């Protein structure tokens, strides 16, 4: 996770740099708990639980219509 060990003041700067790189066409595989970042930048969101992929979808579908109960629970707890 690229922002997990950063001071809060640095998180936005790092995420903004990653957004710029993505917009310039760079391919990235990012593990993150920053759901706003994933929603904005990702082409695909993959959700894992206990080391298993339980859901994979476009950001629009992942956030608007999660299919797996574990994904629904996770999103309900962080998107309040």
Model feature map: region roles:
Residues 7:
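ABC-family nucleotide-binding domains
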Residues 32-33:
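H-loop/switch region of ABC-family ATPase nucleotide-binding domains
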Residues 1-2:
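Walker B catalytic motif
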Residues 60-64:
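Short acidic-hydrophobic catalytic motif
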Residues 38-40:
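A short, surface-exposed alpha-helical micro-motif characterized by mixed small hydrophobic
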Residues 56-57:
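ABC ATPase "signature
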Residues 11-24:
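Helical segment within the ABC ATPase nucleotide-binding domain
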